[in-house]
């Protein structure tokens, strides 16, 4: 086993560029991570404790050549030549304001808002959608595999060296608590289907902080063995909020996060997690939601998230209920109208920002007309003109920064930088 690199030592990349090793940043099961300098640019170097196989090394070089599928990946950008009985690869350094997700689980770092959590969830799904679209699978997603900016929710996924084509294996099976039950039981090798399971586990943990399968079943086994782990995360895996099986419920005093947050989640999220982590889809991998289906659900949730006009906290509003996330606020939220399209249903209340797309692009905002009560205006915050068709079929052009009143039956064509979305205003 390689003991690592010394500070101020040098390496060569496969293209001949010189790597100057600065300092050790951390280490894990596979290797060490150093800050390094290449041609005046500071980067990160992962150096393997054991020399990877020839197949692994060739695949790493191939991933470097083809480039990252998404900006959300800290993707390999160069590979070193073999030296000291091992090798490594370069990747971008993570910014200082990004923290490993395990820090959130330990409450050392907290999200600034629920909207930031939603942003992280959407970015994760979008990154894996683009990865899988290139015929690749990540194979080893776990709570140490990504970093998040707690203020914005922007997300970076690391450890991308295990990415292999779908159906091929990197030699890394992943952690039993995060890999799909069929992998734990040895029925399949990691692929895009098992990625979707791991992604769903991480999404649940983003929202609820606790692990979806670590309820009473795990608490009653303080000494975890391989056989017990195989049973709890493979043969007899059970979601802590399974609709029919109560044997793995969260334990009071232990799973405070899950018990507190789960009741606050919108029904669409609760129902999706219950279905995706339920017995049927645990056993039938091909039935798992795709990344795009997850994105549609998360965008639906984001549409329903508003600022409570009474307390200023976040609130979920849909046609069935209007619940503020602040337990001290019990004032009902009145929705004046809904801005609806085939894929959006946005509640119109005062001081609400209108966002679309996976990036959460702000296209407009609602304000109360000065000197009035309950008369809302929508402002165009894009650089494009919008077209409004009134109930009397009159067409009105709304310039950037312009306003129009909210009236039932209006049809609105909102143009952003790259698309036009057709909305109808309904009561």
Predicted regions and their residues:
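Conserved C-lobe activation region of Hanks-type protein kinase-like domains
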Residues: 203-270
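ATP-binding glycine-rich phosphate-binding loop
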Residues: 2-39
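Conserved structural core of kinase catalytic domains
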Residues: 74-120
């Amino acid at each position: 086993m390689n003991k690592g690199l010394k500070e101020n030592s040098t390496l060569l990349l496969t293209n001949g560029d010189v790597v100057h090793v600065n300092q050790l940043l951390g280490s894990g099961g596979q290797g060490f991570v150093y800050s390094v300098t290449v041609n005046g640019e500071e980067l990160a170097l992962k150096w393997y404790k054991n020399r990877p196989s020839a197949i692994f090394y060739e695949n790493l070089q191939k991933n470097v050549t083809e480039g990252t599928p998404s900006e959300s990946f800290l993707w390999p950008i160069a590979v070193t030549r073999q030296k000291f009985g091992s090798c490594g690869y370069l990747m971008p350094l993570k910014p200082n304001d990004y923290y490993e997700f395990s820090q959130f689980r330990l409450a050392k770092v907290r999200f600034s808002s629920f909207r930031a959590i939603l942003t992280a969830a959407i970015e994760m799904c979008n990154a894996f959608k683009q990865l899988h679209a290139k015929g690749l699978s990540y194979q080893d997603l776990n709570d140490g595999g990504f970093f998040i900016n707690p203020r914005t929710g922007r997300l970076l996924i690391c450890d991308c060296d295990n990415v292999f084509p779908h159906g091929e294996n990197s030699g890394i099976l992943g952690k039993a608590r995060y890999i799909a039950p069929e992998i734990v039981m040895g029925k399949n090798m990691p692929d895009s289907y098992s990625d979707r399971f791991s992604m769903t586990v991480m999404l649940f943990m983003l929202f609820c902080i606790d692990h979806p399968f670590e309820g009473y079943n795990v608490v009653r086994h303080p000494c975890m063995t391989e056989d017990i782990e195989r049973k709890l995360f493979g043969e007899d895996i059970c979601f802590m909020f399974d609709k029919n099986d109560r044997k793995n419920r969260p334990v009071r005093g232990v799973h405070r996060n899950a018990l507190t947050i789960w009741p606050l989640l919108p029904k669409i999220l609760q129902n999706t997690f219950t279905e995706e982590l339920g017995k049927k889809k645990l056993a039938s991998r091909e039935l798992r939601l795709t990344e795009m289906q997850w994105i549609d659900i998360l965008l639906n949730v984001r549409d329903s998230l508003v600022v409570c006009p009474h307390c200023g906290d976040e609130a979920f509003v849909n046609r069935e209920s209007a619940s503020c996330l602040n337990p001290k606020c019990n004032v009902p939220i009145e929705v004046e109208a809904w801005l609806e399209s085939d894929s959006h249903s946005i509640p119109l209340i005062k001081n609400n920002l209108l966002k679309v797309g996976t990036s959460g692009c702000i296209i407009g905002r609602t304000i109360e007309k000065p000197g009035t009560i309950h008369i809302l205006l929508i402002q165009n915050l894009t650089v494009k003109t919008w077209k409004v068709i009134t109930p009397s079929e009159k067409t009105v052009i709304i310039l950037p920064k312009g306003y129009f009143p909210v009236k039932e039956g209006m049809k609105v064509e909102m143009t952003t930088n790259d698309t036009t979305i057709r909305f109808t205003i309904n009561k």
